């Protein structure tokens, strides 16, 4: 429906535009609506080098939060480049060494999601986009959500991309002929995969 759309400025590339909506809205709604992130708070974002995690990181920094990203060793530099101030290699470092945080943004779930609940400070929030959290913070909230279309929020996000305050994270651009291979869920990738359709 038209009410769910926002215009793409003429000076924003279509490929960039295609990579903005879902990661941007997911990050915005998770941080602002569900996580109620405030300046000066600390945030732990799982998958910080991914399409959603990199948006979460950048927006959280803009909002004045201290951001700790997680991922694999190969993701460290990318997560730091997107603005994470600290990084935890989930394969080789101890997640619990992070200490307490005000907000966890979980894009992974499973064991990592469960362990993250124990990192939430009193009054903090665990936000999950992978389903209801399996563990809840002892003295905080656990929230899961499904992103919703929102024209005003999308316009805010697109304007930030246009102004250079927010960068998209495109991992791969493929043709429609290569879509099955490009979107193979068994392949590990970092960033958004864009399928280019030509008439």
Protein language model regions, located:
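Terminal helix/beta-alpha structural elements that buttress the NAD(P)+-binding lobe
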Residues: 1-199
């Amino acid at each position: 429906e038209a009410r769910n759309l926002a215009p793409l400025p003429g000076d924003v590339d279509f490929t960039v535009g295609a990579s903005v909506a879902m990661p941007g809205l997911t990050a915005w709604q998770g941080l602002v609506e569900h996580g109620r992130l405030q300046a000066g708070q600390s945030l732990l974002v799982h998958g910080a080098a991914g399409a959603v995690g990199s948006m979460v990181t950048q927006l959280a920094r803009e909002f004045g939060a201290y951001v700790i990203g997680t991922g694999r060793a190969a993701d460290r530099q990318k997560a730091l480049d997107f603005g994470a101030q600290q990084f935890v290699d989930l394969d080789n470092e101890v997640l619990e060494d992070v200490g307490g945080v005000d907000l966890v943004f979980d894009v992974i779930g499973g064991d990592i999601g469960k362990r993250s609940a124990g990192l939430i400070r009193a009054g903090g929030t665990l936000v999950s986009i992978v389903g209801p959290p399996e563990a809840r913070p002892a003295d905080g909230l656990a929230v899961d959500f499904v992103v919703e279309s929102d024209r005003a929020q999308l316009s805010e996000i697109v304007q930030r991309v246009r102004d250079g305050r927010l960068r998209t994270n495109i991992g791969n651009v493929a043709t429609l002929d290569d879509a099955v291979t490009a979107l193979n869920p068994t392949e590990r990738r970092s960033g958004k995969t864009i399928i280019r359709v030509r008439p």
